[in-house]
Amino acid sequence: MTTHAVLSDREMRLAREASEWRLLSMLFECPSDLWRLQILRLAAEVADPDLKSAVEEAQQEADEGLFHHAFGPGGPAPVREATYHLTVELGYLMSELQAYYNAFAFQPRSAEAPDHVSVETAFIAYLKLKELYALRCKEEGLAATAAESAQRFLQEHLSNIAQPLCERLQDSGITYLAKTAVALARRVGPPSSPSTRFPIVQDGESEGEFGCGVAQDN
């Protein structure tokens, strides 16, 4: 399959959105010196003022102890989707998420649980790149699959975390995380109805046809 050098408006939008989602994901990861450099580089690729401001605050504010205080056991803001479910069994949720990740050959770069907000947001970034690559290869059907899967994943998974996490972090006193959570909630919207469950894409259904290139989760 061939690709074209000039990006269309849609492709440029997807590239921008992928960078924004990747930055969101990283801002929910545990800070380190390398992490600070990485989020600075990513911030140069995005225009979102909330994300840029969060990165600026993180350079001064973020540290491992503060991260674990906010997100660790007993902290004010749980970052795993399972925390916000009242009835879904943990094993079912994990298998559902893993089925999604396997279907698109997504391998998280972090060791966090599959339902951690940093992993779920990284998956959206990855799907944006999948859609972009498919468009570059003129594979509209594959691009549509990636786009539809991203939208369903937002509605059925990240929507369970985004709003309640945002509300909890506003009172945490941790400015960079509060701003990051606002940016996430703005993209995701309110929690979806629990009655609108959707069928999981199974492992053998989709991934083999994405032949133009495999998006890397860097």
Where are these regions (language model features)?
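Surface/interface-facing alpha-helical segments and adjacent flexible terminal/loop regions used
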Residues: 1-218
